């Protein structure tokens, strides 16, 4: 039986056609491990699990599922430096921020995996859980490439993606059907104070 999915790019329901016959690959966004996962996080993970199970059971696809772990960002760095957020189970805190960050995020990564097991996830269904910190060099190279192509700028010691330039190339916001008229310069859309040129720009490197 053919599987039909909603294509957010074409805005139509289409028959799923794999790139390679009999195989499907899924890359889904996992947790940011600065705290325990909540019900809102888990809903997204359950949707990805439902998709991969459906592909396997209904059409017998060989599924390769990768879920990333974001183990470095503003929240993880803030919490690892907060004494009240450090738990005994994480081990002794050292003077090295990198060591502390790894201990802190590893604890919440393990807690996340324990939680999804309780929800019925099978760990052998996952191909890998790559951590963001394992790909820092690759991130740097990509950011440099983006900047060299004129789609990034530096401000306040950070590097930002220039959404306006990419939007003009008619490439940004297609999947989400963004309404750029609702982005207003100077409006706060989150709790972070950034020195970006436009409110729609997002940070690539801090």
List the model feature ranges, each with a label:
Residues 1-206:
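NTP-dependent nucleotidyl-transfer catalytic core
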